[in-house]
């Protein structure tokens, strides 16, 4: 089943007098939508009781939940402290996902600035394997980590980089941000054939079953050569 919904709370939600994310599932249901990506982009600051309340509302209104982990994650950092914090941010997001009855956590992998891209991939794979192992130890293995394609050239997040990363564990699901692919390609991923080529590439690398499960973002975007 294909589901549609917003990432975060829209301006129209607040314009209509609503104020709490707990109200989002009912509002989305009324809008004819059936998915909600809760934003932890600035940190995992939600408490357990509120997360459970959102999750209960989502179950009641048949809203499929996911969480976006903090934007400042960098699993490619060569600084051990920064890498450890990044892993912790993902684990915290996964714990919040359990509370919220979410099954997916969307993750920005990090920056490749100053690092050879092949080396960056090796570091990302190592860091992600460690993250998954620790998640399993914490009983969080039922939550899928969903690394996202990113739009800036110096970020880890080409389509092939994300697919390669997802090969390390079948529970991983790629997040395909078509706006980011459009920006990264200089405006080339913007037609039916180009969208189809992306989906065909996912199936080629990860297989049809995971293609059916992909997480996708669509949004307007402006871009520069960087």
Provide a role label for each language-model segment.
Residues 76-175:
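Active-site acidic/histidine proton-transfer and metal-coordination neighborhood
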Residues 1-94:
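N-terminal pre-domain/capping segments
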Residues 52-72, 125-136, 168-170, 200-201:
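Alpha-helix-loop-beta-strand connector modules within alpha/beta enzyme cores
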Residues 1, 33, 60-64, 102, ...:
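A general structural motif
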Residues 10-12, 40-44, 69-73, 109-113, ...:
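Active-site-proximal loop/turn and secondary-structure-junction residues that shape catalytic pockets
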Residues 2-9, 36-38, 65-69, 105-107, ...:
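Hydrophobic faces of well-ordered beta-strands that scaffold small-molecule active sites
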Residues 21-22, 90, 124-129, 192-201:
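Well-ordered, non-membrane alpha-helical segments in soluble/globular domains
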